[in-house]
Design a protein with these regions (language model features):
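Accessory interaction regions appended to the cores of large information-processing enzymes
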Residues: 1-172
C-alpha cells in the first residue's frame, strides 16, 4: 500500500486516531476524505462496542468508488461510519478494565478477614508488611469491585482500618 498522506489526530476523549490516505488513481476524490474521517470519528465517539469511546485506532483508506452525480459528503460520511463499524467488530476488540493499586492498613487481628474480602473482589495481593501494629496490604483490584469497599472494610474492622487507592493500569 502506497501512503500518500497521514494525519495523527489527538482525540478529545484520549488516545489517537491515525488516518492514512493510500488511495491511488483517484478512486475517491480527496475532497471526500474529510467526510469519511467525520463519519469514522462519529462512530468512534459513539462507541461501537459498549457505548464508550474507541481510541488508539489506525484507519487506512485505500480504495472506493465515486459516482459523478450521486457522490456527496453525506454518502462518504455514512460509508466511513459503516466501514469503521464493520472493521472494528471484525478486529475482535477487547474491553479493558481499570485496575487500581490499593493499600490497606489493618490491625493484625482483622488481616485474614480483610484478605478474604479483597480476594472476593478479584484482588491480586502484591505484598504485605508490618508497620506500627498494623499490617499493610498491597493489592491490585479492578475498580468495579471497589464501589462498596469503604463500607465493607469499616464493617469488618469496626472502623479501625483505612485504605488508599490510585490508578494502576487497564487490563483485560
Amino acid at each position: 500500500i502506497s501512503v500518500r498522506d497521514t494525519q495523527t489526530i489527538d482525540l478529545d476523549w484520549g488516545g489517537k486516531l491515525v488516518f492514512v490516505n493510500s488511495i491511488v488513481g483517484g478512486a475517491i476524490d480527496a475532497r471526500f476524505l474529510p467526510a469519511i474521517l467525520k463519519g469514522i470519528m462519529a462512530r468512534m465517539e459513539q462507541g461501537p462496542l459498549t457505548g464508550s469511546y474507541a481510541r488508539d485506532v489506525r484507519i487506512i483508506v485505500y480504495d472506493g468508488k465515486m459516482h459523478p452525480v450521486d457522490s456527496n459528503e453525506i454518502s462518504f460520511m455514512l460509508a466511513g461510519r459503516n466501514a469503521f463499524s464493520t472493521a472494528f467488530k471484525e478486529a475482535g476488540p477487547k474491553i479493558l478494565e481499570p485496575v487500581y493499586d490499593v493499600e490497606v492498613s489493618v490491625p493484625a487481628d482483622y488481616l485474614g478477614d480483610v484478605m478474604s474480602d479483597l480476594q472476593g473482589r478479584r484482588a491480586i495481593i502484591m505484598g504485605m508488611n508490618s508497620e506500627k501494629g498494623y499490617e499493610k496490604l498491597l493489592a491490585k483490584v479492578p475498580l468495579k469491585e471497589m464501589s462498596s469497599y469503604s463500607t465493607s472494610l469499616s464493617s469488618i474492622t469496626g472502623g479501625r482500618a483505612s485504605f488508599t487507592m490510585k490508578f494502576s493500569s487497564y487490563e483485560l
